[in-house]
A protein has these predicted regions:
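Charge-rich, low-complexity N-terminal segments
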Residues: 2-109
Length: 109
């Protein structure tokens, strides 16, 4: 059997991502909308929007980083002169863990 079942199961990276254009005023909804539209075009990415961030789920960190770049590019194309983003990545390698699994594990406590 060697190698365990990890190769057969889906390994995922989960990230919490938020992006903030700076110097454009207090309303950023249009910018966030464009960033989310850009992210939605990334193949192999699952998203869940929350009030203060978006959760990204992908098979690898590379796909998550592509989403971050796409969102920055979208804001630059809208004329943003400065962009701040926060990215926190959970890349668990010992067992497969999707975002729904993490939520269910807390509910089961």
């Amino acid at each position: 059997m060697g190698g365990g079942g990890l190769k057969k199961r889906r390994i995922v990276s989960i990230a919490e991502f938020s992006i903030h254009p700076i110097g454009i005023g207090t309303s950023v909804g249009d910018y966030v909308k464009q960033a989310l539209q850009a992210i939605s075009k990334i193949e192999g990415l699952i998203t869940r929007s929350l009030p203060m961030a978006t959760i990204l789920e992908a098979k690898n960190v590379h796909t998550i980083l592509k989403a971050v770049e796409a969102s920055h590019s979208a804001l630059r194309s809208m004329g943003a002169k400065r962009i701040s983003s926060i990215l926190r990545i959970d890349e668990r390698l010992d067992k497969p863990r999707m975002m729904k699994d993490k939520i269910e594990s807390v509910r089961d406590c």
